[in-house]
């Protein structure tokens, strides 16, 4: 679990970093559904990382300050599609939440009761972490596909797979 979470964090930084180097209109690119632009997808990757972390936290022991902090943090991620200058903030949010997800992976696997799609369920910590990785991966691919559909072809996802992570980072 540790390697794949480290890879996710690295790939998030690399791919979104590459997106930030493109012309501003790249954030408006979409593949099929115009509601899912690259900008919206990038924002969604960042806000979802917060939500997965939120699902793992023991909120019963939160102080009033911690509750306010997390309320604000979760609201920040639900705003409109970012502009190019906002991608730095998205990268910072991801850097923080991805690091905290990695810390969560070092805890023993445990049952975590949560509401999901309007019903109460009990998920394993490892299930939530696995979904966080899967979710980020599928949306990075969605963003790059949307870019390619609109002629922005400079990002090759093969450059950011686990093989490339090991070669570049050495883990």
Describe each region flagged by the PLM.
Residues 2-17, 26-75, 117-171:
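Short, contiguous alpha-helical
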Residues 14, 18, 96, 100, ...:
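Solvent-exposed, charged/polar functional surfaces in cytosolic regulatory/catalytic domains
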Residues 19-24, 111:
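Short alpha-helical hairpin
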Residues 24-27, 43-50, 82-83, 87-94:
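Anionic, Ser/Thr-rich low-complexity intrinsically disordered regions
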Residues 60-106:
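Helix-adjacent hinge/juxtasegments
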Residues 105-118:
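Acidic catalytic patch
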């Amino acid at each position: 679990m540790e390697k794949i979470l480290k890879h996710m964090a690295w790939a998030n930084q690399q791919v979104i970093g590459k997106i930030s180097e493109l012309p501003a209109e790249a954030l408006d690119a979409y593949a099929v559904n115009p509601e899912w632009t690259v900008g919206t997808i990038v924002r969604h990757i960042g806000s979802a990382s917060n939500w997965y972390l939120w699902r793992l936290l023991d909120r019963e022991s939160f102080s009033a300050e911690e509750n306010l902090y997390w309320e604000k943090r979760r609201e920040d991620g639900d705003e409109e599609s970012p502009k190019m200058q906002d991608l730095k903030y998205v990268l910072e949010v991801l850097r923080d939440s991805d690091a905290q997800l990695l810390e969560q992976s070092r805890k023993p696997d445990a049952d975590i009761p949560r509401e999901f799609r309007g019903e109460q369920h009990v998920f394993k910590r490892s299930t939530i972490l696995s979904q966080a990785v899967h979710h980020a991966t599928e949306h990075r691919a969605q963003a790059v596909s949307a870019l390619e559909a609109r002629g922005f072809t400079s990002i090759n996802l093969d450059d950011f797979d686990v093989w490339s992570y090991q070669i570049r980072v050495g883990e």
